[in-house]
Amino acid sequence: MRKVRVLALVHDHLVPPDDTTGIDVLEAEWKMEYDVIETLREQGHEVRVLGVHDDLAGIRPTAGFFQPHIVLNLMEAFAGITTFDQNVVSYLELLRLRYTGCNPRGLILARDKALSKKLLAYHRIAVPDFTVVRYGRKPVLPKKMQFPLIVKSLFFEASAGISQASVVENAEQLARRVQFIHESLGTAAIVEQFIDGRELYVGVLGNERLEVLPVWEMSFAKMPENRWRIATERVKWSTRYQKANGIMTDAAHLDASAIAHIHRMAKRAYRALDLNGYARIDLRLDEQGRAYVLEANPNPNLAYGEDFAESAEVYGLSYEKLLERILTLGLRWEPERTG
């Protein structure tokens, strides 16, 4: 692609340092931002970084003098509030700035795990049975829901608040875990039928025409038999815990028909939730071979070596080409023509 000016919007505490001498970048919390920004620079693109926390005022003047062709949106929250991420993108649209990633409507639909499941179910895409427990309320289960269940935040991503205790097997455990979500994360809780099986991820790229990346699987080779095989916060973010339990991700070993079915589900979910740019669809595959969509993540981790980039590599997109594909999709997206 042609060389472009890129304004990278990142959380202010995740702005990579200019000099990384003596720093273990692999363990840095800003690794994704560093990987993306430096790779684009190495490709010849001019990248300016702007850290944002609770004020969007800096975007307009910076865009005014820098004149970016596109904004690289790496924001996942605003002022620490995850449900405000769509407002950042809405502001970019009002400024008539091209941007990478998902549109505001898709962010809203995907962020709410209950609303997204209702939409998916309407489109006859299999999802686990669920109920929502609003903040401060006690759980009341529909008759069709049976233990074990899994309790999550209605809005948070990145496995926030998920641990082995999230899978509950009786009413007492359920009440305790719902209270934990309410008090520790300050959000409503979603209680889902627990799907015992394989943890799968599918990356999707595109606006109208979609490309589906290879099905990826999280495996738990050394996990004790009495532990639930789920993507907890420790599983996702603790390298020590990953090594101790043989947790890794790689291309899923499935037959061609299963892969084709899961790919179709991922594409249908992507379209049903009005996503664009790129996203990851999370699924579970039960012991009978039935796949269920758990949720969609419209801003997956783009760090080098992470699931999305690794599956793109297997698909035939190098890390450099993946990032340029994401830029190209953002440049081609026309928000005023949607709906």
Task: Report residues per predicted region.
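A short beta-strand motif that forms the metal-chelation/ATP-contact edge
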Residues: 6-7, 72, 201-206, 289-304
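ATP-dependent carboxylate activation and anion-phosphoryl transfer catalytic cores
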Residues: 119-121, 253-339
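Active-site nucleotide/adenylate-binding loops and adjacent lid/helix of ATP-dependent enzymes
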Residues: 1-10, 64-67, 107-198, 209
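Phosphate-binding site of ATP-dependent enzymes
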Residues: 171-264, 287-292
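Hydrophobic beta-strand scaffold residues
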Residues: 47, 98-99, 127, 149, ...
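Short acidic, glycine/proline-rich loop/turn micro-motifs
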Residues: 17-22, 160-163, 306-309
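ATP-binding N-terminal substructure of ATP-dependent carboxylate-amine bond-forming enzymes
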Residues: 1-100, 104-105, 109-111, 122, ...
